[in-house]
Amino acid sequence: MNFEEEMNAIIGRIRKIRIEKGISQLELANIANFSQSFLANVESGKKKPSVMTILRIAEALNVNPREFFPDSPTVNTKEDVKNQIINLLEKI
C-alpha cells in the first residue's frame, strides 16, 4: 500500500468511527477544537492530517489512535502511532 492509499484508509477510518458514534463533523470539530471546515477538508482528503491532528481526533472520539490503523497490529501506543504517522508523512 502506498502513502496515498494509507492516508486515505486512515481518513476513511476516522470518518467511519465518527459516524458509528453518531457524532457530526461540527460536534467532533468542536470537541477537538478544530473548525468544521478544517475537519471536512481532512475527511474529504483535501487536507492531510498531521500527527497532532490524528491524535486530537482520536482523543475527541475517545478511541485508541491505533483504531485508525486496522491493518497495523504492531501499533500499540500513542507514541507508536505518532511514529507511524511521521514515517508516512516523510514519504511525501
Model-assigned labels for residue ranges:
Residues 1-20:
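A short, Lys/Arg-rich alpha-helix, primarily the initiator
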Residues 12, 22-23, 49-52:
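Residue-level signal for the short linker/turn that defines the boundary of a DNA-recognition helix
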Residues 17, 31, 42-45, 71:
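Residues in the recognition helix of alpha-helical DNA-binding motifs
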Residues 19, 30, 59:
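Alpha-helical residues within the helix-turn-helix
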Residues 22-41:
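Short alpha-helical DNA-recognition segment
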Residues 52-67:
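DNA major-groove recognition helix of helix-turn-helix/homeodomain DNA-binding modules
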Residues 70-92:
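Short, charged recognition helix plus adjacent turn
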